[in-house]
């Protein structure tokens, strides 16, 4: 007997792709939730989506200001780009619309993340080298 309460799992309709590499970037949990929601609502052909901070916030259970903070984090990490849109009302006035989000290829974000880590390690190595030279100079005096 077929159970009528369970639907078949169609991978095209009931799931969305989330790259495994996103977990290597050290994103905060809130930024990961916002990024996941944007991946969920994106148009798979243009990699773009429209959503207000309020819409995203209600989907991931955050306030609009918190969503704004995490969107800024995602932009800084190079995972998304945002573009302001405008709408024209029926009476001809121009108003701000919701943001247009473009999800960028994750490879660029990963490369940027590792370049930042390497730059930080280079700076630490340089500081260590300077510290050792300073100690050697102080011992020589």
Which residues does each predicted region cover?
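Generic signature of intrinsically disordered, low-complexity, basic-rich segments
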Residues: 27-32, 115, 132, 136
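N-terminal intrinsically disordered, low-complexity, charged/polar
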Residues: 1-10, 22-24, 120, 126-141
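Generic alpha-helical secondary structure signal
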Residues: 19, 39-44, 57, 74, ...
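Winged-helix/helix-turn-helix nucleic-acid-interaction surface
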Residues: 65-132
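Short recognition helix of helix-turn-helix/winged-helix DNA-binding domains
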Residues: 1-66, 94
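Small/flexible residues
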Residues: 6, 11, 40, 46, ...
């Amino acid at each position: 007997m077929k159970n009528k309460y369970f639907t078949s799992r169609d991978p095209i309709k009931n799931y969305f792709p989330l790259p495994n590499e996103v977990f290597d970037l050290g994103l905060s949990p809130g930024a990961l939730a916002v990024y996941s929601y944007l991946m969920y609502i994106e148009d798979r052909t243009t990699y773009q989506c429209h959503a207000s901070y309020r819409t995203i916030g209600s989907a991931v259970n955050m306030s609009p200001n918190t969503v704004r903070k995490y969107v800024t984090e995602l932009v800084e990490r190079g995972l998304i780009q945002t573009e302001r849109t405008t709408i024209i009302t029926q009476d001809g006035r121009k108003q701000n619309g919701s943001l247009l989000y473009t999800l960028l290829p994750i490879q660029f974000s990963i490369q940027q993340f590792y370049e930042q880590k390497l730059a930080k390690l280079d700076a630490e190595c340089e500081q260590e080298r300077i510290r050792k030279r300073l100690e050697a100079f102080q011992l020589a005096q």
